[in-house]
Every structure is written in structure tokens, then in C-alpha cells.
Amino acid sequence: MQENKIYIPEEDPYFARPYIDVEEWRDTPLRHLYVHGGFEGTKKDGTEVKFCFYFPEKEKYEGRFYQYVSPAPEDEHESEHLTGEDDKISFALTHGAYYVVTNQGGFSLTDGERLFKSSANGAQFGRKTAQRIYGYEHRPFGYIFGGSGGSFKTMSCMEMTKGIWDGGVPYVLANPMATPNVFSPRVRVMRVLGEEGLKKIVDNMEP
């Protein structure tokens, strides 16, 4: 069995040319410094590796970042339309952290390593950007998270690298209980008790 080699971003010339094309203060959803960019020479199947960083004001920064990986590679702006409990940007900004998201390099059926390499290089360049923005040398603590398909990506990022993230939270992992047939008990309750009966159960179960 071939042993997996730990990936070290600093040794990969493929990601050696990061760039920033937007850096501006924004007031929505909360005041933050927005940074957008990518890595030159990383285009594959028409998609270049790109990233977005969202930095809180200096007095609110506590030396950490949160990085989200979605179930499927999407636009690096994907978190900007989220609201309420799903608003990951606001959560990071109000918890002393800057927020990191990449487009994961886009969809690729032939390069399974592109995801964790894109995520790792996004995280590391985010650290360098944080040092520049906040004006002092430090290593921001990093935490990566993702649900459903993103849970596997979170584990991949943690397992295939070392020293990039200090913790990871994979959630709603796919397993036998996550298959569609587990919805059948709910449907049976609705069939036997009717829609009103199901509403009563939900009402009693909610806090």
C-alpha cells in the first residue's frame, strides 16, 4: 500500500503566485475588510483557484480564523448571501476571527488532491495577509469545518496536511443512517397520524 505523503504548501511551486485583486472595507453584514484573490497559473478545466477573506476590525480580532468547505466546490463568494444562523461570516467576525473560503479549485474528476491543496494554500496565504493587515508577526490559530460532503473534505484537509489547521469540525457525516430510507419513519407517522398528528409530535419535541 502506498503511503500518503503529508502535503506542505510552502514546498508546492504550483501555488507560488498568489495575488489580491480586491481589498476594501465593507459594512455588510458587519464592518470588515474584504480581500479577494487567487493563485496565478492554477487554472484547470476553466477554473482558477480563488479565495475570499473577511477580516474583523483590529480591536475585535483575537488571533484566529474559521475556514468553511462546502459539500461541492462552489463560488468563493458563496457565504455572502447567507443570513440568520447560516451567516458564517458574521459568526466569525463576532467571535474574534477572520473568515476564509476558497472555491476549492472547482470541480475536478481527475485530481482528488486539488481540494485540500487549494484549501491549505488559501489558509496559509490568509495567515500572511492577516499578519500584514494587523501589523504584527503571529500565527493565527485555524479551524476548518464542513457538513455533509464537506465533512469528508474537512477530514481530508486535516489528514493530508500538518500544521495548517489546529482543529476541524466535520458534521452530518454520510453513513448508513444518512441514507434516504431513514425518512421512512417520518412518512409512516404522517400516514398513520396525518399531517396534524405529525405537527403535534413536532410541537412536543421542540424546546
Predicted regions mapped to residue ranges:
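Generic beta-strand/beta-sheet core signal
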Residues: V69-S70, T102, F145-G147, P170-Y171
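Short, structured coil segments at secondary-structure junctions
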Residues: H95, T161-I164
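Short glycine-enriched nucleophile-adjacent loop
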Residues: S151-K162
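A catalytic-pocket lid/entrance helix-loop region that shapes and gates access to the active site
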Residues: W165-P207
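Alpha/beta-hydrolase fold nucleophile elbow
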Residues: Y136-S148
